[in-house]
Amino acid sequence: MERRRSLNLMKFLRGISTTLLLFLAGTGSLNAEEIGIGVLNGTVATEAAFLNAQPGTLAQEGETWNFITPTAAAKTSATGLKTVRGTATQASISFNNPGYCFSNGTFAADKNRDYLLMDSWAGIRGTENVVISQLPDSMAEYCHVEIYGDCNTTDRDMLYTVNGMVKTIQDRENFSGTFNEGANKVTLRYVPVVNGVITITGNGADSTRSAINAVRLISPAPGIISFTATPPEIMEGSAAGAELSWKTWKCGEVTLNTKDGENIPVTTENGTGAITVNPEQTTTYVLNARGEDGTKSTAEVTVSYTHLRAHETPEHL
């Protein structure tokens, strides 16, 4: 009986340790500073209507959102943006000459706050842009940027370039209450911030405009910025192999292993590292990083391996 109690106690303690580890791994996101910005156009989508509506999955209970009503072919700015916790900042936003400002008419009294945020939009293309400046210190180097876009048509590809990083929304339907990556929102992780500024541009000058309904900025936790394999595929008999390269931010420990558990010694200096691998079969590599604050992040890349047929050499392919 005493042995059974001891075993149960050990299982209980292991459960506590596992739970604690998972909790500590997520503390970076819990402490993140966020700024939410919504566009208001038309007569129905108003700040008062937002406050009276039920919370949604994007605009959650108790969160503070900043609103701006852009004017077509003009510069419209808002200053003193607040975080979702209601803390005032020096951040500001400027819609610079959007060519089109519209309300989709999807918001009504029985809809939640997500519908209001997706109701109104400003369209940008060419030199028209959105500039968010004087970001808080937590976003001084990098920032996660979420852009929510839903125009008044159901067949538009909308490009977004944010400080050199690019994502596309393929808008194929009106907002129906669910957010889907690539369909009505895009997420750009670890966007490099330039002198406290984030600049968003849309489609090219000869194309239709990219819609901006809402933008959310999130201060990032320490983690992996990028992890790539070049080339992603190697052939049997190739001596060059593939180069794995990575970039991390504020991480004190970085390790590399294959998905089946083989450890690969690596060195990371100033947040960057690289190593050449030459697997003899398709192999997935796992990069693990521990941030200075204890947060953990993981990224994977796969190097595909192609077997040659008889009488072939790599030069024949």
Residue ranges and their predicted role:
Residues 264-271:
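Short beta-strand segments within Ig-like beta-sandwich modules, predominantly Fibronectin type-III
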Residues 247-253:
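Short proline/glycine-enriched turn/loop motifs at strand-loop junctions of beta-rich domains
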Residues 222-229, 308-309:
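Proline-enriched interdomain boundary motifs that mark the N-terminal boundary
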Residues 290-294:
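Short, solvent-exposed loop/turn segments at the edges of extracellular beta-sandwich modules
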Residues 232-240:
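Short, solvent-exposed loop/linker segments at the N-terminal edge
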Residues 306-315:
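Conserved small/polar residues in nucleotide/adenosyl-binding loops
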Residues 32-221:
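Compositionally biased, intrinsically disordered or flexible polar/acidic segments
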Residues 271-284:
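Solvent-exposed segments in extracellular or luminal domains encompassing
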